[in-house]
């Protein structure tokens, strides 16, 4: 959850919501606890959390990314990279009809939505419907985080009934069918100086 930026941007209509957060870094997590004392923030790895399945209405986050895996027994058999693991576990934690809105990497960093290996997208497509995705220019987080990395915002809704093995999957599972917006190229570089 970082220092709780998503909590701070919560619309007034959701001000009575119960807030939960998970932050690996102890200093950052303690700052979030101070800023949002009514939120239940765990300072721990997501793989060590014990939230029950099907309890959250909405999950929002900026998932970690990288070419590594964490060990979490129920998910180890899927052999998912860290960012894809966050999707998989979160899908289980939201209720049927619940929404997931995650910022995740794309492009040469082995992103969730465009890497050649479709395993993670197949996992998501069996359990969720894709509501939409936005590809951000690689300069989106330059001023705030000092990084130039291409990112996607992915919106999923958990299905009432998962798609069965052998049932056709939606076209977004295949990378060659992924459509990007006109403001970024396939590597996430900006095509225009501004958007109006």
What are the functions of these language-model segments?
Residues 2-4, 8, 92, 124, ...:
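Extended, compositionally biased low-complexity polar/Lys-Gly-rich tracts
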Residues 1-61, 66-68, 105-106, 154:
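Conserved S-adenosyl-L-methionine
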Residues 68-72, 112-113:
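Conserved ATPase-coupling elements of RecA-like P-loop NTPase cores
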Residues 143-196:
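Flexible, glycine-/basic-rich loop-and-beta segments that form/coincide
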Residues 64-66, 106-109, 140, 160-162:
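Conserved nucleotide-binding/hydrolysis micro-motifs of P-loop NTPases
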Residues 22-26, 79-142, 149-155:
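Conserved Class I SAM-dependent methyltransferase catalytic core
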Residues 73-78:
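Short glycine-enriched, charge-decorated loop/helix-capping segments at active-site entrances
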């Amino acid at each position: 959850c970082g220092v709780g930026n998503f909590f701070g941007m919560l619309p007034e209509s959701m001000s009575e919501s119960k807030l939960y957060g998970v932050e690996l870094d102890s200093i950052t997590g303690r700052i979030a606890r101070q800023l949002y004392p009514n939120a239940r923030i765990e300072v721990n790895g997501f793989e060590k959390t014990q939230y029950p399945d099907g309890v959250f209405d909405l999950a929002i986050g900026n998932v970690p990314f990288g070419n590594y895996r964490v060990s979490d027994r129920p998910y180890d058999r899927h052999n998912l990279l860290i960012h894809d693991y966050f999707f998989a576990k979160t899908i289980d934690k939201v209720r049927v009809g619940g929404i997931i809105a995650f910022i995740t990497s794309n492009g040469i960093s082995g992103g969730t939505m465009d890497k050649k290996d479709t395993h993670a997208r197949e996992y998501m497509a069996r359990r969720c419907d894709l509501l939409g995705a936005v590809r951000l220019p690689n300069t989106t987080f330059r001023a705030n985080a000092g990084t130039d990395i291409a990112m996607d915002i992915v919106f999923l809704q958990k299905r009432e009934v998962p798609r069965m093995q052998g049932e056709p999957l939606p076209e977004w599972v295949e990378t060659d069918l992924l459509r990007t917006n006109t403001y970024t190229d396939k590597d996430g570089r900006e095509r225009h100086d501004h958007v109006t």
